[in-house]
Amino acid sequence: MSFEVGTRCWYPHKELGWIGAEVIKNEVKDGKYHLELSLEDDEVVSVDTEDLNDDKNQSLPLLRNPPILEATEDLTSLSYLNEPAVLHAIKQRYSQLNIYTYSGIVLIATNPFDRVDQLYTQDMIQAYAGKRRGELEPHLFAIAEEAYRLMKNDKQNQTIVVSGESGAGKTVSAKYIMRYFASVEEENSTTIQHQVEMSETEQRILATNPIMEAFGNAKTTRNDNSSRFGKYLEILFDKETSIIGARIRTYLLERSRLVYQPPIERNYHIFYQLMAGLPAQTKEELHLTDASDYFYMNQGGDTKIAGIDDAEEYQTTVDALTLVGITTATQHQIFKILAALLHIGNIEIKKTRNDASLSADEPSLKLACELLGIDSYNFAKWITKKQIVTRSEKIVSNLNFNQAMVAKDSVAKFIYSALFDWLVENINTVLCNPDVDDQINSFIGVLDIYGFEHFEKNSFEQFCINYANEKLQQEFNQHVFKLEQEEYVAEEIEWSFIEFNDNQPCIDLIENKLGILSLLDEESRLPAGSDESWTQKLYQTLDKSPTNEVFSKPRFGQTKFIVSHYALDVAYDVEGFIEKNRDTVSDGHLEVLKASTNETLINILEGLENAAKKLEETKKAELEQNNPGNKKPGPARTVNRKPTLGSMFKQSLIELMSTINSTNVHYIRCIKPNADKEAWQFDNLMVLSQLRACGVLETIRISCAGFPSRWTFEEFVLRYYILIPHEEWDLIFQKKETTEDDIISVVKMILDATVKDKTKYQIGNTKIFFKAGMLAYLEKLRSNKMHNSIVTIQKKIRAKYYRNQYLKISQAIKIWQSNTRGFIIRHRVYHEMKVHSATLIQATYRGYAIRKNVFNVLITIINLQTRIREELKRKQLKREHEYNAAVTIQSKVRTFEPRSTFLNTKRDTVVVQSLIRRRAAQGRLRQLKSDAKSVHHLKEVSYKLENKVIELTQNLASKVKENKEMTERIKELQVQVEESAKLQETLENMKKEHLVNIDNQKNKDMELQKTIEDNLQSTEQNLKNAQLELEEMVKQHNELKEESRKQLDELDETKKALVEHQTLNGDLQNEVKSLKEEISRLQTAMSLGTVTTSVLPQTPLKDVMGGSTANYNSLMLDNAELSPGKSRTTPMSGNHIDSLNIDQDNGANATQINEELYRLLEDTEILNQEITEGLLKGFEVPDAGVAIQLSKRDVVYPARILIIVLSEMWRFGLTKQSESFLAQVLTTIQKVVTQLKGNDLIPSGVFWLANVRELYSFVVFALNSILTEETFKNGMTDEEYKEYVSLVTELKDDFEALSYNIYNIWLKKLQKQLQKKAINAVVISESLPGFSAGETSGFLNKIFANTEEYTMDDILTFFNSIYWCMKSFHIETEVFHAVVTTLLNYVDAICFNELIMKRNFLSWKRGLQLNYNVTRLEEWCKTHGLTGGTECLQHLIQTAKLLQVRKYTIEDIDILRGICYSLTPAQLQKLISQYQVADYESPIPQEILRYVADIVKKEAALSNDSKGHEHSSGIFITPETGPFTDPFSLIKTRKFDQVEAYIPAWLSLPATKRIVDLVAQQVVQDGH
């Protein structure tokens, strides 16, 4: 062992059993090792030892496992398999609300003393169905599933042994195992939640639970529902592994509980259920009052159990009894017997000095005998007397008071025990009758038996219980050893024999010929046998070698004996052993009971006799088998002896062990965590004692002796490949195809590099086997390697950082030096440049001064010349401009007056013309009113009005054009004004220049200035004149606009007059329009040979058919027209419609058409066959896709054909034929949809949804027409009308039901198809590059991957298919939204349920991948207009967030709860506890895990306190798997504008085509 400083270990503790410690000092003093340990309670202890590797040294602490292993799911995977490690692992898991833990083949179940219904839901059953043990978390259902699959696959019977002390939860565990077998589905139907009702047999099997609990369970100090008997339930299966029945065997019912209960305990539940649940009349009949009035019920004190309603439990028991075939009358007889037992308990026996007396008139006695149907005198007699039978006579003697009390209690116990056995036998008769017995192929047995018991006072019951546990423990040890051996052999590894503690000496002590039981039976058969004499025989016979190794007598007293059991030594008190072992009733009482008038009691006693005879025959057969050479027994040896309780128990135990040994056994050890039954409280010492008692620690010891730790090659390589240089494994990892041999070579390299002692491990065929402690050693190496690697990386990073810092500083110094030198040189050069520059500046300045002087003189001369030339040129330009302006002004003045005159004249002329035209129009209007009925006149009027509108429009256009010209003229004038303004600005500039220059030449330029001012005044006057002219033109423009507006108003008035005229002639115009349409339709029909008309002709067929057919033809679909196909119309029969010519005489007349139609429609057999096989089953779905645009007729052609056929049937009054026809159609459509699968599911399903919707809309349209149109009643009697309404109404309901059914069938199939893809795509696939979650290695997946993979692209393709099919097939948007929303909710539920059950899967990288996958779904929803898509995926979205955020403080958890508001506390706790910490992450602190678990507990407590409110504490989301609401029922039906007679060319429907052909011919003739 290694006890370096910092080593974590365990140290013994009086109160806690073991406490965590850490080595803080390890030194050698005087040849001894001196250790100092710091305990978790801050105490420091010292340990001195000579050898740190001495395993037998009890003073040495035990090594503690690494944190990653401390809460492991399987105790055998612990590196250090020792007592404190096992205890701590169970405690850690329990604190995290995980009540199940594996210990090799054993499942340890720790009682939570709280309701954990979420662990046993149907969802949980389906989660474990078909899963191998170890795939999911430890669970009761994993054991049940393993047993079920082994039975099914290996054809071998199975046994599940459920053991534990009272209050550990055995009964509940056994009950849920039975529920699993009764509820689990076949593997191929686990895709959708189990919805099928359980069979009657399964219900009866489950019904045995409340019956057995009522008659065999009671409240004890340790348990409110303690089983006081052992039970072995065989669930029987046939060849198809279907449950066909069951058998129950019971062991050692605690009979003494009937007559005695310790304080705070109760009698069997059934008595209290009777008191609370029996009707008042029945209670009066049975003479029952209150539980406190009966001695057999009130000894314990409180008769109530908190939280249990005995009346409700009574009803459950009664229902269960009825279910297993016990009639109400028999139940009443049973209740009478139970009531009689209570009255027996109240019998008061009088005590005398030596004897006891009992009157036959004692009230309780009379009531008891009345209910039992027996003689009270004889019954009382044998309570106080006994009879001894000798060879020659019978001796009757009196009993003393104590003996009489024992006799009274004995008969009560005898009756109750017999009743219990009879109930079991009766249940077996029902559940395993001869027919069932013949079909039995295999069974799974569930053994619910008491665990090892030891109290301050241990009696006969504890002895039998511990004897049974000795036998079971022996079988368990042998089974564990056998499995270990089998695995070693299968893996072909070297192994040596493992020593284990064999408890055979203890079993021999109990059951040998001179063992405890034999001596007990011998003493019990003696009339004067007593506990004391039996004790002396035990001492004399057994307290010597070799039995004294397991048997001893106490130091003081002669009333006890001690047996060394496998768990611990137990001292048994001999008082009552003989009496309890005899457990017989006197012959007198037996005769009295046999004379009963209670038929049920008689049947009970007969069953008891039969069982005794069977037992005696079994014993005889065993004797003959064991002594085949002996002579036949003589008369002295044929004495019939009543079997003792001990012998019966021994025999039943032998049979049980024989059964178990012939089956494959599974073990569940139930642990009671505390004595106070407090929820989620853990008592270390109590649990430790149970672990020792139930053999878990012994199992671990056996495992430790061999190779307890087993790793697959894949797991080992993934964990420890870093222990070897990367050059050795990198080549293998980089291979495209990695073989298993490559992985094994990596395994060997790792082991060769790390483990020097080859005996510490063995390499098998599929696994590596390690000795105890090796995993911790490898973990330490791995941790050291990672620590060293981290240190190296940090060292390199720090070196790189400081080197970069040094280089930066060095570079900075060099730069500074360079800059300094440069600065000095530049400063020197700058000084020299300044000297040179000063000299140069002086020379330059002198030259500049001279040049400037000369330049100023030259400039003055040039400026003078320039001014003179400018003035001369300006005068010339002014003269030219004045001339041009004068010409322009004269032109404008000359044209203005004539133009104004012309415009005024034109305006007046237009006004006069308008008035004249209006008057003419008014006259014309009056003329039109009189001629309104003339079609030609109306056309002429319309034509003239159109011309008038055109004329007015042209006038308006000319006005607009003229307005535009005026606008352009205004723009020209504005340009001129702008030029004038520019000229003025130029003059102003010139003026300023003159003012600057005239200072030196003021006198010279005075005259020039005056001249310029005169010119300026003249220019300003011209500008004013131009502005006046512009204002005049703007005024004219406004007048023109006003004139245009008036003309527009006049035009509007004219249009209004025209509208009024059109309104007055609306009726005529409509008529003309309809006539035009009719003409156009007839012309089209003439050219194409086809016509349109209503679906049904209006002519009655009374004369045609020669009978009084009801006038069903009056159903007219006013808006629904039958139109033939357009460009794709196909020939419907040999008489092609195109060949029809209305003007020719060869067309068939109406009578002939109707007669042929009637004949075709009446022969429904041919029509049904053709429609069913040819149309409905032989349909072809049109291609639907992104770029395909389908017309409605291409989609709903089956519905349109059915509508035509149906309409014609109604027209001819063929109601019965239509009913049978439609029944066939409805059945066929539903069958077709039911058979859809694969790639046809989506398009074909949408196709039939569209067609059924079309049919339903037609029927609704027809029904509304019948109910709202009075014309439909014409020609019908009231009865005929009601019959017709009823027919269509029923048809509406049928199509509504069909739509609902096929929608549900289709959607469930979609869910099933989606389930195969969703989990793989959303949960497992890693679509986000660069963030591999790393649960599995890519190169190893090449070897081990064997499942079909799906990605998010497959999911999006799936949804795209639905979208495009629904869009192409004209499905309403609301339906599309409903379908996708339902599927998204389903994806959310199943993926979340898969995630929450995944082990070693949930990591932050997995959260990134999940978030990416879900985001792609969200984006798809937004792209396709589905705004609620995000809400449907909330659980997945929030799970992804949970995996990515911090979870290390209480504040983090509180924030997390706010983020993940859709997740329940139980779901949060489950996800956090399942979170897989990466190597570079810190583990989630245990305090945080406990904090989250406490939140769940508080939530559960609140839900339990709030009555009437259901609280969902389950971890699963229940997927919505139907029934679904039909979204079509929430939207309006489709409108019927046209029913198109389109039959695709590829359809072979001769009769149907002929019907449509004839209907079309009839339409043509009706139109003609």
Curated annotation (Swiss-Prot):
Residues given in the record as ATP binding sites: 164-171
Residue span of region Disordered: 619-641
GO biological process: one example: protein transport
The organism's place on the tree of life at top rank: Eukaryota
Region Non alpha-helical, tail domain, annotated ranges: 1089-1568
Region (Actin-binding), start-end ranges: 443-523
Keywords assigned: Actin-binding, ATP-binding, Cell cycle, Coiled coil, Motor protein, Myosin, Nucleotide-binding, Protein transport, Repeat, Transport
Molecular-function GO terms, alphabetical: actin filament binding; ATP binding; microfilament motor activity
Entry's Gene Ontology cellular component terms: cytoplasm; membrane; myosin complex
Chain ranges of the Dilute domain: 1223-1498
UniProt domain IQ: residue ranges: 786-808, 809-833, 834-856, 857-881, 882-904, 905-934
Domain Myosin N-terminal SH3-like: 4-57
Family to which this protein belongs: Belongs to the TRAFAC class myosin-kinesin ATPase superfamily. Myosin family.
Subunit: Homodimer. Interacts with calmodulin (CMD1) and the myosin light chain MLC1 through its IQ repeats.
The protein's name in its UniProt record: Myosin-2
